[in-house]
């Protein structure tokens, strides 16, 4: 099967320099959703027709299994498909999709393709309470589809029809090429309508079949920021519904955003206003506190993420406790039962089991052993203005509060660093290392007294 995706529209109502099909829905471009669905149908050829912002669209797709055709002038959907004809295989049917209709399910498209087979024309239609703006499906007395009439070209009788065209169709490729060559633009829009091939098929006696989506939202397109926002909410509601059906506890299903792929184990609990981006995995029994932002991360079984944490490209070990207000940056790997507390930032570091940094610390470019305690205010000074260096803290070390470790430096096994230490040389294992000014008490010292000004 050939698949052609139309993605050349100007998108004037979006009021944006970004091509319409590149606007994000659930964290990825509208067109990316359509291409993902198209790939699931295993097409032999996949062609995207581009126009406005075509170079940016090509750059976004950047995949060897997708080829492109260009529609320099926006002269209608029929004209757009014409631009792709020389890339299509005549021996298999062609399915036409739209880059701004992102949520059509593969199951629905398979039903349409199955109904049409190799020799029939198939149209995806839907019944709408308010069909305003859509092309109407015209059937004869026997129920056969005879034509599709666009809103601006419809008479009063046709405007009363509630079955509408979604624009998605499949038909034999050789016939499609013949019909497109006969299209005319003598209509209110002055465009070449792809839907006119329906009338051509009917006049030749070719059977026209139809299929219907399970839900209206599968056929909704995006022409404005308002419609994009509405479709985002619909999509997020559907994703939340699936999580609930899979056994995830959502404290408020209307207050979660998934902008990628979220995989959850058993007995996962997610509080309000959490955002998941990229590929996120939550193990069994994980609890996510309110207002967390988690991107491309794995949270292992039994871990708890307290409110207002930001986690990106990190791994959180089983039974660990993170936050509140903690930040795990790319390259962070935490083993089991690690505690990262409030206002602690960890970057490109590995922290072994049972270690803790509970308050106000920065751990960057570090390797931390097991059972290490990192005191409040501790900083690994990893950057000299030109290069970054690593800090190594071995098992059972105790780092006192307000300590600076100037990398590259090593803290030996079981070593203790006194509070306020600035460590510039390795600290030997099992020893107390302190680097700070000696405390002095000045006997008889008095605070200065403010002098009185003369009147």
Swiss-Prot record:
Region labeled Pyrophosphorylase — which residues? 1-225
Q: Which GO terms describe its biological process?
A: cell morphogenesis; cell wall organization; lipid A biosynthetic process; peptidoglycan biosynthetic process; regulation of cell shape; UDP-N-acetylglucosamine biosynthetic process
Q: Where in the cell is it found?
A: Cytoplasm
Which Gene Ontology cellular component annotation is one that this UniProt entry carries? membrane
Provide the primary localization: cytoplasm
Q: In which pathway does it act?
A: Nucleotide-sugar biosynthesis; UDP-N-acetyl-alpha-D-glucosamine biosynthesis; N-acetyl-alpha-D-glucosamine 1-phosphate from alpha-D-glucosamine 6-phosphate (route II): step 2/2; Nucleotide-sugar biosynthesis; UDP-N-acetyl-alpha-D-glucosamine biosynthesis; UDP-N-acetyl-alpha-D-glucosamine from N-acetyl-alpha-D-glucosamine 1-phosphate: step 1/1; Bacterial outer membrane biogenesis; LPS lipid A biosynthesis
- The protein depicted here goes by the name Bifunctional protein GlmU
Question: In which organism is this protein found?
Answer: Ralstonia nicotianae (strain ATCC BAA-1114 / GMI1000)
Gene, per the UniProt record: glmU
């Amino acid at each position: 099967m050939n698949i052609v995706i139309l993605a050349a529209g100007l998108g004037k109502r979006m009021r944006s320099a970004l091509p319409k099909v590149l606007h994000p829905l659930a964290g990825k471009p509208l067109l990316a959703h359509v291409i993902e669905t198209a790939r699931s149908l295993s097409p032999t050829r996949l062609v995207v027709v581009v126009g406005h912002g075509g170079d940016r669209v090509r750059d976004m797709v950047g995949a060897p299994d997708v080829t492109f055709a260009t529609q320099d002038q926006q002269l209608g959907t029929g004209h757009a498909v014409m631009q792709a004809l020389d890339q299509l295989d005549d021996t298999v049917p062609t399915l036409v999709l739209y880059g701004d209709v992102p949520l059509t399910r593969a199951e629905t498209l398979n039903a349409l393709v199955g109904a049409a087979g190799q020799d029939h024309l198939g149209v995806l239609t839907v019944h709408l309470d308010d069909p305003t703006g859509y092309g109407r499906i015209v059937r004869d007395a026997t129920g056969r589809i005879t034509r599709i009439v666009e809103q601006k070209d419809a008479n009063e009788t046709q405007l009363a029809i509630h079955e509408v065209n979604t624009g998605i169709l499949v038909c034999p490729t050789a016939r499609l090429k013949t019909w497109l060559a006969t299209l005319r633009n003598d209509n209110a829009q002055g465009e070449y309508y792809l839907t006119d091939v329906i009338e051509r098929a009917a006049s030749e006696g070719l059977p026209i079949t139809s299929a219907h989506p399970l839900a209206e939202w599968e056929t909704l397109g995006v022409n404005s920021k308002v419609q994009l926002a509405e479709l985002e909410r619909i999509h997020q509601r559907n994703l939340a519904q699936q999580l609930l059906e899979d056994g995830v506890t959502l404290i408020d299903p209307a207050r979660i955003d998934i902008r990628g792929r979220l995989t959850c184990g058993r007995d996962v609990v997610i509080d309000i206003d959490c955002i998941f981006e990229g590929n996120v995995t939550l193990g069994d029994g994980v609890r996510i506190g309110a207002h967390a932002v988690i991107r491309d991360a794995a949270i292992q079984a039994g871990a708890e993420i307290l409110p207002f944490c930001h986690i990106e490209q990190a791994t959180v070990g089983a039974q660990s406790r993170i936050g509140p207000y903690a930040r795990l940056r790319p390259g962070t790997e935490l083993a089991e039962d690690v505690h990262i507390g409030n206002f602690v930032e960890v970057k490109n570091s590995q922290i072994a089991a049972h270690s803790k940094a509970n308050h106000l610390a920065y751990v960057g470019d570090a390797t931390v052993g097991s059972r290490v305690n990192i005191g409040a205010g501790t900083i690994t000074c990893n950057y000299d203005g030109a290069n970054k260096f690593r800090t190594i803290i071995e098992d059972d070390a105790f780092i006192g509060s307000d300590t600076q470790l100037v990398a590259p430096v090593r803290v030996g096994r079981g070593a203790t660093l006194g509070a306020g230490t600035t460590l510039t040389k390795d600290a030997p294992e099992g020893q107390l290392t302190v680097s700070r000014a000696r405390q002095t008490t000045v006997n008889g010292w008095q605070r200065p007294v403010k002098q009185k000004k003369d009147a």
